[in-house]
Design a protein with these regions (language model features):
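Active-site neighborhood of HAD-like aspartate-dependent phosphohydrolases
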Residues: 1-43
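Short, acidic loop-to-helix structural element flanking the phosphoryl-transfer center
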Residues: 3, 80-108, 114-118
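Metal-dependent phosphoesterase signature
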Residues: 36, 41, 58-97
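Helix-loop "lid/cap" segments that line or gate small-molecule binding pockets
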Residues: 29-30, 49-63, 120, 152-153
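Asp-based, Mg2+/Mn2+-dependent phosphohydrolase catalytic module
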Residues: 1-5, 97-100, 113-216
Length: 216
């Protein structure tokens, strides 16, 4: 059993099933505008920053103005679909509550902006368990850079190496690993690459498995 001093969770795709909603909104937005986005590109969007995703689509489509309209349309669809269809990932509430109740400080490190992230955490009853939260609009470099995890550790007052991180995406796992954290991956859309699979301490089927690995 591992004994971290704190646990840092990603949000999108890890605690809440935003990746399913995001992929559906991308497919619908692209279809509305007559654009075909390959499944491989949609999978690459998992854990990807908006600027990086935009660059990928511009390289595919070649029309910057069309891409700007696509991203605007997708953002509107995503917010509507998120409010209607979003669910927690299996075991998310139970895992976060169990770690908190065992006395482990729990933090959130999400690329989503605070104004969008915190209402979701309140909605699902998770906000009450976090000792600190770091959001995408509060850091300079997005995942796979380690900034957000380093900042979470700083706010927790804990060395990054003494923290466990929980992620669903390859880019997110790379960020946590680069920060020096013991990293678990709970993949849904994006299978871990061989190097990430080797570097992570565990690849979990669901968050139901996590408490036993950290608190027994």
């Amino acid at each position: 059993m591992l004994s971290p001093q704190a646990v840092v969770f990603d949000m999108d795709g890890t605690l809440v099933d935003t990746e399913r909603v995001s992929q559906a909104s991308w497919r619908r937005a692209a279809a509305d505008m007559g654009i075909v986005l390959p499944d491989s590109m949609l999978n690459d969007f998992v854990g990807c920053s908006i600027p990086n995703a935009r660059t990928m689509v511009i390289e595919l489509v070649g029309d910057v103005q069309l891409v700007d309209r696509l991203f605007s349309h997708q953002a509107e669809l995503f917010l509507t679909m998120r409010d209607e269809d979003l669910e927690m990932r299996p075991g998310a509430f139970e895992a976060v509550r169990a770690l908190h109740d065992a006395g482990l400080p729990v933090a959130l490190a999400t690329s989503t902006e605070r104004e969008h992230a915190m209402p979701l955490m309140e909605r699902f009853g998770l906000a009450q368990f976090f000792s600190t939260t770091v959001c995408g609009d509060e850091i300079e470099r997005s995942k796979p850079e380690p900034d957000i995890y380093l900042e979470a550790a700083r706010r927790l007052g804990t060395r990054p190496e003494a923290c466990a991180a929980v992620e669903d995406s390859v880019n997110g796992a790379r960020a946590a690993l680069a920060a020096g954290m013991v990293t678990f991956m709970v993949p849904e859309w994006a299978e871990p690459t061989p190097e990430v699979r080797t570097a992570c301490v565990g690849i979990l089927q669901s968050l139901h498995e996590l408490p036993a690995l950290l608190i027994g």
